[in-house]
Amino acid sequence: MSQMDRRQALRVLGALGATGLTAACSRWVGDDAGEPSSDEPVRIGMVAAQSGAFKPIGDELIRGFQLYLDLNDQRLGGHPVELVVADEGETPDSGKAAVEGLIKQGVVALTGVVSSAVMSAIRDTVEQSKVPLISSNASPATLQSVVYIWRTSYVNDEAGRALAPYVAQRVPAGGRVAIVAPDYDAGFDAVQGFRQSFGESDDRIADPVIWTRYVKGKPGRNTYAAAINEIMSRKPDALYCFFSGEAAVVFLKRLHEAGFRKQIYAPGFLTEGTVLEQLKVSEAEGILTSLNYSADLNNAANRRFASAFRKAHGSTPTTYAVASYDAAQVLDKGIRLAGRDLSPLNLNLALGRVGQIDSPRGPWQFNQPRTPQQKWYLRRVQRDGQVLSNVLISELATLG
């Protein structure tokens, strides 16, 4: 090669090198602390029920996550987001198939998951894949010793644990509390948490739990007839129950028809979402519930979130939407902390450093089991103009 040829070749190689460096720099713009802004999209897998009985909750999970993206330029950690939604369905098998499909698509993280039964079924799949899952709803109490599963919602027994001391203070000595719930994972946890916190040896909850058959979809008119007959025959001073969605609507209507007028206590899912829209004032007014969120919480994060949610969807935000909104915030912080190494393994390590989350429910942070340490609130169903609303009464406890 002549001297001229060598010079020309060096100029070409130099130009190519500069072009490559420029291209790399155009993808990563940030400071020396490792907080890049990138045009490289990050793919997130959303597992949410889009069919079956859990679809209303699945819709709320999608709305909450998408709202965070809408308020943050469609980016997480400086990256544009490709959100891939897979239908969880309503069975463990359908949920597991959704998770496996998303992992095969190369997502850097998973989020969502409505059903506790699905969560139990996908535990090993997630742990073995080492793709972090930031679950925004399902949270069975039996889910322990996990490395790659984080939860932004709660543990299923916590609503009952938070509420029980309040109920215990208000039921007189010699009184009785009837307990009723469907016979599936979340129902078992809701009852166990309440009984443990109330005091399992307390005579006021000594009567056997009234278990109902778990029904997928809308229950029939007589689905809860036997349970309600048992409640009425016991003549309790108060009722603690666990239902949600269509099951809550049917149960409360039939209970009112049967003539039950004592105080009803429940985890907040009993009156969350569209439940109150389907009930008369006489069927729901005065119900007391415990939940980690109330739409009327007075803090800056909730004012922003609730206003944007109502504007986007014309409805009151729910705890389901908040947990998913927070899952997006967790990923936003985690991806930024992960810096240039956005492998699932490095992202999972970064999630352990996200610190306090400025949530609409109030500030919270992950505890050692990877669930929120957070406040729980007492709410009462009251008239708000022409509609029924869950109105914040007080704080109950901080759990986690």
Regions found by a protein language model. Give the residues of each.
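Extracytoplasmic "Venus flytrap"
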Residues: 36-38, 45-64, 68, 86-92, ...
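Extracellular/periplasmic periplasmic-binding protein-like sensory domains
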Residues: 252-325, 338, 389, 393-399
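Periplasmic-binding protein-like
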Residues: 102-114, 134-136, 178-181, 235-245, ...
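Short, solvent-exposed amphipathic alpha-helices that sit
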Residues: 57-72, 94, 133, 159-162, ...
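Beta-alpha junction/loop-to-helix N-cap segments that form part of ligand/metal-binding clefts
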Residues: 28-32, 60-61, 71, 75-143, ...
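Segments of small-molecule ligand-sensing domains
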Residues: 311-321, 332-387
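Extracellular/periplasmic Venus flytrap/periplasmic-binding protein
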Residues: 141-142, 149-259, 295-304
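N-terminal export signals
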Residues: 2, 8-27
